[in-house]
Amino acid sequence: SHGLRGLDALDSADLMIIATRFRRPDAKQAKHITDFLNAGKPVIGLRTATHAFQGAEQFAESLSYDQFGRQILGEQWVSHHGKHKVEGSRSVVEPGASGSAILNGVGEIFAPSDVYGVTHLTDSDTILLRGAITESLDPESRTLVDDTRNMPMQPLAWLHTYTAPDGRKGHSFCTTAGASVDFVDEDLRRLIVNAAINLTGGEVPAKAEADFVDPFYPTFYSFIGEPGY
């Protein structure tokens, strides 16, 4: 969990896409993130990015590692709302959000990762999709429509305006989908492509290309139990 390589790439980047989990960069590494945020540049957070970092160390006085998800993406780690590794997630468009350019060409998304609990979004956040808990990890499994956990469904994708450590405003997009196996779904890939285009000021096409660049054979998410890994 200690250290994070390659953060110097943020110095010239237009967009940060983050999917880390409970990392603890050293002070030199963290400064690249702080400088990026202070420039007001956009951020895309995938699934575990709500708890991307851990510890009381700080990016700045107003932003500790533990606070990154809540302050920059709008949410922190809360819970597994669905049964982990048993129930999946199916996207449902939030009423009033269908006109968002980020949803252009995005059909129903199925994510084998379970629905996360999301409880800290505010009226200033824009929910685009909610996640319905499904009976199993099979893409054809039924939505548990009568399950109280789907009343209401938890947010699955949203837009957030963050305040950087130096007070500058920036924009972020977050989805609690995004485990490796989730990206088998073309519509999830298109959602992320659309968000990247939108947040960097581009015009989102009616149906962005979201094909794999190289063959993609994801392994199911789990911890690696090998000693010393």
Residue ranges, per PLM feature:
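Helical hinge/lid and interdomain linker segments adjacent to catalytic or ligand-binding clefts
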Residues: 1-52
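Short, flexible, glycine/charge-rich loop motifs used to bind or transfer phosphoryl groups or to couple energy/partner
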Residues: 5-8, 99, 116-118, 163
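Extracellular/periplasmic catalytic domains that process cell-envelope and extracellular macromolecules
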Residues: 8-12, 37-39, 120-122, 149-152, ...
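Stable alpha-helical elements in mature extracytoplasmic
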Residues: 9, 29-33, 98-102, 188-192
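Structural recognition of the beta-strand scaffold that forms the well-ordered cores
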Residues: 14-19, 37, 42-47, 93-94, ...
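Short, solvent-exposed loop/turn segments at secondary-structure boundaries
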Residues: 22, 57, 184-187
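An acidic, glycine-rich "communication" segment
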Residues: 46-141, 148, 208-229
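Extracellular ligand-binding/catalytic regions of CAZymes and related secreted enzymes
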Residues: 135-229
